[in-house]
């Protein structure tokens, strides 16, 4: 089996799917479902999800989260779903200084949430975006810097650096 990133021209960059305008430097949410709803609302405000689809998208992400937690441990969660409301893969990032219970594998709170919504009809793009996110989240240095991002510009700089220097 060939990894997605090994296919010529198939590597997806953060700037192709992360909506920097939808970054939330300090989530107001105290729990997982509210954090997801807050990030979906940020994507609606940024024009990435139609407002009439907001409740349905949030509900779909929460349903997916109830099936299996996306709290991968080490303070990070990547809730994700495929949904007809989007035509392109889109992501929003939210930070929590107090931490949110995502029923993570390590049973620790989540401080950085990357919400990923993908179109139903393009599973390859979904996998490419997921591969990029998880490849970087495996690195302690990346997670540390991600948690320190408090503005869209800081987030954009970090993700650009990560795309340009995948080995760090």
Predicted regions, residues:
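Cytosolic covalent-transfer regions centered on His/Cys nucleophiles
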Residues: 1-168
């Amino acid at each position: 089996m060939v990894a997605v990133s090994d296919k010529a021209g198939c590597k997806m960059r953060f700037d192709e799917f992360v909506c920097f305008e939808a970054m939330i430097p300090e989530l107001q949410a105290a729990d997982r479902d509210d954090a997801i709803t807050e990030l979906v609302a940020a994507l609606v405000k940024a024009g990435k999800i139609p407002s009439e689809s907001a409740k349905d998208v949030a509900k779909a992400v929460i349903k997916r989260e109830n099936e299996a937690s996306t709290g991968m441990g080490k303070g990070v969660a990547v809730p994700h779903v495929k949904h007809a409301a989007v035509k392109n893969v889109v992501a929003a990032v939210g930070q929590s200084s107090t931490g949110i219970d995502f029923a993570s594998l390590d049973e620790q709170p989540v401080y950085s949430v990357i919400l990923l919504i993908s179109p139903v009809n393009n599973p390859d793009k979904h996998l490419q975006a997921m591969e990029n996110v998880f490849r970087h989240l495996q690195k302690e240095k990346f997670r540390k810097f991600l948690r320190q991002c408090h503005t869209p510009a800081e987030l954009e700089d970090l993700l650009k650096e990560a795309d340009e220097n995948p080995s760090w």
